[in-house]
Design a protein with these regions (language model features):
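ATP-dependent carboxylate-amine ligase
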Residues: 1-132
Length: 132
């Protein structure tokens, strides 16, 4: 199952997308593919840290991150309970797809969320081929 919400991203829309993922997925595994939220100004790092905490608290199985603030998000997610071995970084389709293919299983719920300039939509055709 794939939730594609990677056209625009801000702290509120990410929080709502996570809430939707949790509600729809039930007891299935949850995977988040998250690209940076852009154009947030001076508070950008703090917003990414808060989103990381929310991700970590949402019982996510795996987190895939793209962007300059990915390490901040990852650190906060790990501090909030996400296993560091289930956090992955990618810089484009070439590195994301092989890693996702290793992790994603049939029945998993995948949320793609990030600003449009992160180009997460480029991952959709491949994700659909192997289970999303």
């Amino acid at each position: 199952h794939l939730i594609h919400d990677a056209y625009n991203a801000n702290p509120l829309s990410v929080a709502e997308a996570l809430k939707t993922l949790v509600e729809l997925s039930g007891s299935s595994r949850r995977i988040v593919v998250f690209g940076d939220m852009l154009e947030l100004g001076d508070h950008s790092a703090a917003y990414h840290e808060e989103i990381g905490r929310q991700i970590g608290a949402s019982k996510i199985y795996a987190l895939f991150l793209k962007g300059d603030l990915a390490r901040i998000t990852a650190s906060a997610a790990e501090s909030a309970g996400l296993d560091r071995n289930h956090i992955f970084f990618f810089d484009g389709k070439g590195t994301a797809i092989p890693a996702l293919r290793e992790v994603v299983s049939k029945g998993d719920w995948i949320l793609l969320k990030g600003s449009r300039k992160m180009h997460l939509d480029e991952l959709i055709p491949d994700i659909r081929l192997f289970g999303g």
